[in-house]
Structures are given as structure tokens and as C-alpha cells.
Amino acid sequence: VNRAVLVTVDGRPLADPARLRGIRVAARLDRPAQCELTLAAAPGAGPLDPPVRPGATVGVRLDGRAEALFTGEVTAVEREYAGDGSALARIRAYDPLHRLRKRQELRVFESVTAAELAGELCAGLGLGVTAEDDGPRLDRLLQHRHTDLELLCEVAGRAGLHLGVDGDRLRLFTLDGYGDPLPLTLGETVHALRVTENLDRAGAQCAVLGWHPQRAEPLGERAGEARSGRRIPLRPDPGDVGADGVRTAVDQPGRSGDELAALAQAGLDARVAALVTAEGTAEGDPALRPGRRIALAGVPEPVAGVYVLTEVVHTVDADGHLTRFCTAPPGPPPSAAPPAATVTLGTVTDVDDPDGLGRARVTLPAYGDLDAGWLAVLCPGAGRGKGIVALPDPDDTVLVALPGGEPASGVVLGSLFGAAEPYDAGIVSGRSRRWSMRTGTGQSIVIDDDGRALRLATDAGSFVELRPELTTVHAAGDLVLSAPGRAVVVRGRTVDFLHAPAAEDAETAAAQARTLARSAGGG
């Protein structure tokens, strides 16, 4: 290495800097920066020199530069042996962001923005958080299958935000970039450059259509102006290639218009950033990082101006310090089917919905008892002023549908008896012959095909029973027949009024009714 470089391991400089053969630091949006050190090692079976172990801290600084080229933690150590006995040691390290992809917990975040989530996840990593935009506030966010880094990248990405470590801070920024543009001039500080105008991903507007899973409300938002840090005279027109329409993402669950607006904005930002991109090789500068703005000069006027870096690779070796850079935004993920809806079991913990929307609060045992929050409950015929309302009770087991596999978007499909025996399965001779509905305190409706009866009963013993041969109305308490201002008509072959001074239970009353009907010449 022909440029003065200070490499430290656990705060101590290398014992023999002359053994350093090369340094490579690669950084791109939303990924931990990687540093690889290549050193000449002791030949044969000699001990590793330097004696570096995973977990050691590594720092790389260039002579005369205030900011570090890299600060991070060793994750891998390799030794490569040649047939002549010579050996190379390769030490691979990542910046502190790498620890987020090694952690995965089951937990719930309430009322959190992307910036606040980053602050919580980075607590203990020695990284502060600086955000150009906080992103929309999410009512409820469940971490269940993601690592910390995957969760943060997904939440930030849906808000059009990108991640990058800058010294002791984690920056969240849009594709507008940050900082004053760093000047780069072709023929002076830039050795090679390629500028590309590409309308393959062009789009004039982006729209998102979705729905609120708890309120069952349709949502829709649109973005028509991108946040782009590229400021050059060349302005490609998507209409030149027939891309002046609206690109629409559909069936997106979200709890607010802000969420969907941010998602639409993120899509448009990426499409516009890809219209004109630059990549090249420049004189090495540690200040060149993903997210930084650069000002290209010495090129034709239409493409001269400001761009935003998305990827940089620093190399320090016998040829000096060079930086390869690129401004192309991350590409779209491979085309795939949307995440499938899944179903899982839930346990109801509360039904006293603070918003009065008939929801149930549910935990998910198969997800580590994560609190999914207040979920909508499927009710037959539900609508304004109508429908069947039959909510579960606390401790009931329910079946929950998870659109896109997301617990926070769940919908309760219904309750399950599970291991609890039904109070009346209604099976007669191997057929389902009786349907029934019963509340927890014993009010019931029974439709009995086997007995050809319809019965409505209270827990106190009052009932109305309809059979082909007999209809019985029995009151366990006082009975009032009332039609104020209207006529009351009692018709029959005979009409009898009998005195019954003693109360009777429901079974006795039903038997007495059948006896009286037969004695009067009925069924």
C-alpha cells in the first residue's frame, strides 16, 4: 500500500504495517458497509499474525483525513496458503449495522415512525439516528419473522427512506440525498465515467390502492412529483416511451392515507432516480458515501450537475486509493407472487373496543403470544344498522386470517371450540339435525330438525317453542300482553283460562302445555 494508512485492531495499530497488501471498503444503500483487509501472513503452520478474532473492532484511517474510512467489527478471518508456503490473511469486518441482521425478536412497536424504530433498534450499538424525514406514523408494528435489519429496511423502504452509517450515526434519507455536493471533475478527480439515460423503469406517477384492515375502509393515494437529488439539465420524458401513465400497486394493507402516500412516493422516487445514472472511478475520498450528493463537472452540459450516490467501493492498494461510485437506485425486487394470506389461532384478551367498532383484542400463541391488537371480527350481514353481532369473549379461541402474513392486519374469522366440548353438537343418527346458538349465560335459540321444533329460551326458564302440533309461550316471570291503542284478538275453537298459582320450571311447563292441548282436543 503506497499511501499512509492507519489500521487499528481493538484500538492498537498493526504491529507490522508493511504486511498490509490491500484494503477494500464496500458500502451501498440499506446494507452494512463491509471492509476486507488483506495481509501477508506467517507461512506454514505458524500462528495467525495479527492474532485477530471475530468480534474485534477494526478502524481504518487515511493520512491527513479527519474522518475514518471505516469503523466496524470483525466477523470472519481467513487464511489462504499457496504451494510455496506463502500465506495471506483476510480479515472481513462490517460496520455496526451488521448486528441488526443477527437479531430477531418477537415484539410489538406501538405508534412508531421509521426514525423512532431506528432509534429503538440501534440502542446499544453506539449509533445515533439522524433522519431527513421521519416517515409516516404506524399505529402498530409486529416483529415476528424479520431480523431487526429486515424490519427496519422494510419500514423505511415503504416510506421511501434509505439507511447508511456515517461515522457514529445512522442516517435515514430519501433519494434526494444529503449534504453539500462534493465536486468531482472528469480528467482531474474522476478517471473514468459512464452516464446512462435509461427509461426502462420510467413512470410519470405512482398510485397505491389498499384498505384499512380494522376499519374495512378503502384507501388510495397518488404521488406525482419525485424526491430526487439529481439536478441536471437533461430531463427525460417517460412519455417518449409510452410510460406517461400511472403505475398502481394494489391490495396494500395500511392504517392511514399517510402510509399509502409514502409508499406511492417511494415507488416514484426510485423510478425517477433510475432515469439518468452515473458510475465511475474517482480519486479516493472517505467522504464519498451512499446518500452523499456529488457535483459532476468536465462532462457535456446536459449531464453535468448534482447526483446522489447509492453505492461506493473504496480500494487502497499499491495503485493508491480509488473510489468506484454509482448513483443507480436499488432495483425492484424479483417479480414474485404477493405474500399469501395465512390463518392462525388467536386468543381473545379483550372485547371492550375503545373505538366502539366491534373489534376484539387478540394474542397469537403461534407467534410467541404477540399482541396483534384490536382486530376486526367477521360478522354475517354486517353493514350500517344491520347484521349479526356475535363477538367472542375473553379467553375464547379464534381463527385469524392474516392478509399478506402480517399479524397487525389480521381479521377474526370466527371462534373455535378446540379442545372444549360443544354444549350441543346437534348430531342425531350421524347427521347434523340441530342448530343452536347460546350465550355464555344461557340465553338460547335452537332449530331442531329432529324434533321439528324452534325454541327461543332465556336462562331464567322462559321460552317460546314452536312445534307442528303445539306452540307454547311460557313465562318464568310475570307475563304482560300489551297493545296500547290497538286491538287484541284471541281466536280459537275454544278459549280456556286456567288458574296456576305455583311457578313451574321449563320442563314441567312444556309437559303441562302438551297435556292441556290434548285435553282440549288438540295435538
Regions inferred by a protein language model and the residue ranges of each:
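Juxtamembrane "anchor/assembly" segments of surface/extracellular structural proteins
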Residues: 1-54, 94-98, 185, 194, ...
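Surface-exposed, non-catalytic interaction/assembly patches
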Residues: 101-108, 157, 166-240, 264-281, ...
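Short, Lys/Arg- and Gly-enriched loop/turn segments at beta-strand edges
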Residues: 65-73, 301-310, 405-415
